[in-house]
Every structure is written in C-alpha cells, then in structure tokens.
C-alpha cells in the first residue's frame, strides 16, 4: 500500500498550508490503520523534526494521478 504523508519540516512554527510538503511510503500492512501507524513510526524515527499533519492511503486512481503530475517518488529510510 502506498501512503502519502503530509508534513511540515519543523515543529517550531505553526503549520501553514503553503509550507506543507508530502512524501510517499510503500508500506506492507494488513490493514489501513496498521499502515498509517507504521508510516507515522517510520517518519518519526527517521525525521523527528517533521510535524506530521495527515497520512492518506492512496487509491489506485489517486496513485495514477500522483504519478502523472511528476511529484511522485517513494521515500525510503
């Protein structure tokens, strides 16, 4: 399953929509909830300075759209 993690690069400032970034993780999980938990743990362990806003499971259609826009790249820690 592919998850899109929305985050701010620092926890020091208030979140702003304009500075929200995203990364993509390929998570092997048995449920959506387990995948979200694993994604959060991975980001928190490897990038503790990130302020995670939201974690979204990408549907096939949304994944295809993300690939078409050119912004899609799996992050590996």
Swiss-Prot record:
<dbReference type="GO" id="GO:0003677">
    <property type="term" value="F:DNA binding"/>
</dbReference>
<keyword id="KW-0804">Transcription</keyword>
<protein>
    <recommendedName>
        <fullName>DNA-directed RNA polymerase subunit epsilon</fullName>
        <ecNumber>2.7.7.6</ecNumber>
    </recommendedName>
</protein>
<comment type="similarity">
    <text>Belongs to the RNA polymerase subunit epsilon family.</text>
</comment>
<keyword id="KW-0808">Transferase</keyword>
<dbReference type="GO" id="GO:0006351">
    <property type="term" value="P:DNA-templated transcription"/>
</dbReference>
<comment type="function">
    <text>A non-essential component of RNA polymerase (RNAP).</text>
</comment>
<dbReference type="Pfam" id="PF07288">
    <property type="entry name" value="RpoY"/>
</dbReference>
<keyword id="KW-0240">DNA-directed RNA polymerase</keyword>
<comment type="subunit">
    <text>RNAP is composed of a core of 2 alpha, a beta and a beta' subunit. The core is associated with a delta subunit, and at least one of epsilon or omega. When a sigma factor is associated with the core the holoenzyme is formed, which can initiate transcription.</text>
</comment>
<dbReference type="InterPro" id="IPR009907">
    <property type="entry name" value="RpoY"/>
</dbReference>
<keyword id="KW-0548">Nucleotidyltransferase</keyword>
<dbReference type="GO" id="GO:0000428">
    <property type="term" value="C:DNA-directed RNA polymerase complex"/>
</dbReference>
<dbReference type="GO" id="GO:0003899">
    <property type="term" value="F:DNA-directed RNA polymerase activity"/>
</dbReference>
């Amino acid at each position: 399953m592919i998850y899109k993690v929305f985050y701010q690069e620092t926890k020091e400032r208030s979140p702003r929509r304009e500075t929200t970034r995203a990364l993509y993780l390929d998570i092997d999980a048995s449920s959506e909830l387990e995948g979200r938990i694993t994604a959060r743990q991975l980001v928190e362990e490897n990038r503790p300075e990130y302020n995670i806003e939201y974690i979204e499971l990408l549907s096939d259609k949304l994944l295809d759209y993300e690939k078409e826009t050119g912004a899609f790249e799996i992050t590996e820690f």
